[in-house]
Amino acid sequence: MTRPKYVASCSGGKDSVATLLLAAQHNEPLDEAVFSEVMFDKDTSGEVPEHRDFIYDRLKPFCEKKLGIKFTILHADKTYDDVFHHVITRGPHKGEVRGFAWAGMCVVNRDCKIPPVRKYNAMLSPDTVSYVGIAEDEPKRLARLDGVKKVSLLAKYGMTEVDAYKLCQEHGLLSPIYTHCRRNGCWFCPNASDSELLHMVTKHPDMFDRLIEWEKEDNIFHRRLTRRETPSEVKARLLSKSQTGFSSPRSKYEMEV
């Protein structure tokens, strides 16, 4: 009788990377790590550039060469470009271009991140075990796991979010995103913090200006990037704020380490 396949969901964030490290440390079975990459358009990643580079240049080679496991990167058929330029087909805004995603309603997650994961999961054997990066100090999220087909190694070995941060740091596998934000997400996320947005405005202005170009297109229904501001308004406010002493907050994990 062969054992089931063991797969780790991996965003490249501290909890999912710590899960990979724990599996190696404790000789837990692990065959593959899976990352679903949202794309801005066909050629540009939706990941913050530094995080995208971390995935491709550090984490993927580490998994394949050091851990000896497959690292699979999934992509949806749709990109954020497709989501933004979707033409509304019914209702009072029929015929208008949808525009930016709404804060709190993650159409990007629905259309660009989840579909390839579902397609991948459909090809797996029913007895496949999935490792998920949920820390011991996240009881509400842990309560949703069955502990059989979906397992948290962080909880099994008593690791909190701070512990996960430290473990990644010790192994040189902490994503650089934690220097300016507390989580990893798309660089055009409507729920992004000011520090995340400022990072894109100042470090990757050409990319952020793509959003401003879209904002100025004709027949756009939703022009706001965040709950209150368009991309051009976000840029103007943050640049003005940075000139008067804006500082990026330290990660709560860094402060507790």
Segments predicted by a language model, with ranges:
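Nucleotide-activated chemistry modules centered on ATP-dependent adenylation/adenylyltransferase
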Residues: M1-V257
